[in-house]
């Protein structure tokens, strides 16, 4: 563990009070264990790992909101965490704080085959989503290399090999439920294909890397499952070719 930067003792003056309140809220789902912190202090990037002060595991939007209110009141940094597959360093808690692991919020909440969309929690993995909806004849098209969570894909504006045909996450998300830094819960967008009702807050949050709020629910667009899938490989002598 010598290569992992540990921010303890926490530079955040109110952390101890905040963690006491988080334990009262979540019981064993609020952890300061070193192994748990180590898992959540890194991603797949080259940036050096750094331990958070604590890790919490909410199971619904109301708990995320309560966590945010506690951390906001004590000025404790919050870092949303999904599959940990990011290669951009955004998950690393450089100032300590509380990592909010969203993986226990992994439900498919609703499917609307007639409208070609569904509503999911952020901790649901993309492959699991496609397994759950395969009987509808529809599929979720965005396919980054890793089996990322839908929340993580939204926060990073993910893309993949299917992007040239179907589009990126910016094209797939129709609406969001988001918990703001002070714990307020807002909804953006709608299931309508076209809407000019107010500011386009949905696309403000897509790709924001968790800096503007914590995504707790996503309405995503679906496509008819292709009847045939063909793969091909192209080889080139060098990069210039």
List the predicted regions and their residue ranges.
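Short, basic and Ser/Thr-rich N-terminal targeting/leader segments
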Residues: 72-74, 81-83, 148, 172
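Residue-level detector of family-conserved "landmark" positions at structurally sensitive sites
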Residues: 32-33, 81, 129, 143
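Glycine-rich, histidine-containing beta strand-loop boundary motifs that form or position
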Residues: 80-84, 91, 102, 122, ...
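FAD-binding subdomain of flavoenzyme oxidoreductases
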Residues: 107-111, 120-241
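N-terminal flexible segment immediately upstream of the FAD-binding catalytic core
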Residues: 1-72, 85-116
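Short, ordered loop/turn segments at secondary-structure junctions
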Residues: 35, 82-85, 145, 191
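Residue-level detector of anion-binding/catalytic polar loops
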Residues: 76-77, 139
